[in-house]
């Protein structure tokens, strides 16, 4: 007989602003059995995360108000539980993996200290016993050379590695119920498969229930027993996974299932001139030891990468987290030191100082993965987008800058009337459009796109890809597209480079690499996607 772990009964949640309450979760009912995985899917702003955070009462009250319904764990109410009862449940019986590890990990503490804290608080383990448990868990979530990484701080890890540490932190408590809010968003397909296998194994060992929030439908197919679809705060469809994927009944579910990235890259202009020529690019970070922190060695993270990129062309850079993708992008932007040759539009960049680089900078722009981190929360949209104009076109008046901001907001599909709002007032997809507008306003020739769609749900992802294609065709933009989502790469890129541990495994025309990969690692990535 199955045992109900969690029951959400007719839950409604609202946010109060002065005298009005805006309902963001409306009459939602969900149930999770022991050993079962329920996937919660839907676009950003649909109420998925608010529902999940409500389980452990992690939302600030006020402004949050629980308008109706209840949440029961083993039959006991969590919404009406005392703080002492909740402290006994949080982490011990119900653990949570958050989407953004940079917000969740303490930047001032080493990995070992943060992981030991979990074992000390929740399982009462001493440091000696905890050390082995920590190493084993880090190894299981795919952290290479785990013993050497224990003294690292969060900023010394790649985005995917930070997410794996977050997953390890949640699993160390051996919870009865795991709430996973987009836990594999920042991970490449190989590590993603490894994490999903680990979650399945632990679920079997512990008979653990799991609430898995994601916008990645391929993960839902592989992992979930049942699926609940949310739209505008309501649960519009709920069924077992096989039935829902085979015959969805709600129009919104049908739309979600049909929104996988598709299509071909935009046609290349003829003739297409070479815009970027990179030869033997190498990046190494110093290893410092001792009291005086002397350099004793170097960690080579990018090893002799060479490629050319033409005007109007997209080059995809794919590979597992920690493979050197983002480091390559930072080296091309001259934001970190590197060796080798970087020639942009006939101009060598490697030996230019900061002043000499300034006239070129507006022609090479970047859009980062997480607009929450890359957009200043204290500036409104007008101030964010016009910031580059203040640096590169200082003679423009405030009115001229505002006119350019209005024009570029139209171009990226944003309402210019919202230009005086702040980033927190926009959805994830809208924030990424703001980031694209900030890059586009300087009329660049090359945009480095570092995982620009990985944190977006499928419907919004498709809209951003369509936008990027139309902008590329209109302005003859070249893109360096960094991604672990091979479906997106296939739809956008003309050329592709596959990286592993800083080295080029395979490169060539995207159509050829996807149709007939030459290397085993590339074949593995494609098989897992």
Predicted regions and their residues:
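ABC ATPase "signature
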Residues: 235-239, 247, 504-508
């Amino acid at each position: 007989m199955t045992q109900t772990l969690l029951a959400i009964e007719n839950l409604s949640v609202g946010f109060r602003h002065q005298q009005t309450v805006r309902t963001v979760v409306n009459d939602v009912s969900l149930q999770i059995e022991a050993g079962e995985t329920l996937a919660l899917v839907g676009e950003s702003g649909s109420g998925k995360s608010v529902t999940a955070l409500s389980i452990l009462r992690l939302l600030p009250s006020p402004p949050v108000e629980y308008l109706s319904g209840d949440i029961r764990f083993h039959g006991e109410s969590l919404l009406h539980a005392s703080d002492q009862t909740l402290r006994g449940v949080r982490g011990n019986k119900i653990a949570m993996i958050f989407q953004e590890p940079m917000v969740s990990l303490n930047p001032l503490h080493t990995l070992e200290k943060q992981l030991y804290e979990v074992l000390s608080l929740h399982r009462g383990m001493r440091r000696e016993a905890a050390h082995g448990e920590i190493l084993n868990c880090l190894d299981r979530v795919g952290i290479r050379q785990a013993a050497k990484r224990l003294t690292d701080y969060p900023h010394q890890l790649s985005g995917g590695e930070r997410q794996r540490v977050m997953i390890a932190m949640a699993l160390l408590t051996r919870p009865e119920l795991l709430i996973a809010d987009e836990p594999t968003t920042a991970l490449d397909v190989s590590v993603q498969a490894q994490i999903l296998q680990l979650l399945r194994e632990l679920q079997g060992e512990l008979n653990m229930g799991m609430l898995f929030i994601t916008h990645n439908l391929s993960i839902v197919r592989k992992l979930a027993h049942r699926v609940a679809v949310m739209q505008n705060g309501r649960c519009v469809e709920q069924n077992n996974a096989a039935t829902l994927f085979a015959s969805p009944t709600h129009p919104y579910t049908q739309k979600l299932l049909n929104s996988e990235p598709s299509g071909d890259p935009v046609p290349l202009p003829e003739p297409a001139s070479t815009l970027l020529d990179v030869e033997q690019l190498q990046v190494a970070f110093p290893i410092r030891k001792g009291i005086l922190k002397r350099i004793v060695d170097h960690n080579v993270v990018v090893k002799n990468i060479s490629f050319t990129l033409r005007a109007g062309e997209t080059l995809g850079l794919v590979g597992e987290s920690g493979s050197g993708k983002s480091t390559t992008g930072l080296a091309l932007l001259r934001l970190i030191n590197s060796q080798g040759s970087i020639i942009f539009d006939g101009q060598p960049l490697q030996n230019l100082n900061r002043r000499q680089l300034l006239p070129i900078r507006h022609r090479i722009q970047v859009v980062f993965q997480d607009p929450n981190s890359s957009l200043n929360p204290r500036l409104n949209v007008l101030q964010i987008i016009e910031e580059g104009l203040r640096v590169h076109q200082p003679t423009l008046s405030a009115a001229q800058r505002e006119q350019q901001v209005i024009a570029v907001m139209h171009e990226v599909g944003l309402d210019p009337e919202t230009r005086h709002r702040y980033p927190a007032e926009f959805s994830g997809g809208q924030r990424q459009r703001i980031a694209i507008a900030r890059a586009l306003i300087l009329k660049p020739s090359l945009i480095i796109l570092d995982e620009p769609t990985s944190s977006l749900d499928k419907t919004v992802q498709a809209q951003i890809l369509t936008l990027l294609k139309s902008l590329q065709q209109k302005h003859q933009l070249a893109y360096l597209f960094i991604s672990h989502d091979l479906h997106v790469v296939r739809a956008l890129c003309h050329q592709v480079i596959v990286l592993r541990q800083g080295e080029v495994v395979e490169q060539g025309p995207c159509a050829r690499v996807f149709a007939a990969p030459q290397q085993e690692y590339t074949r593995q990535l494609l098989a897992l996607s």
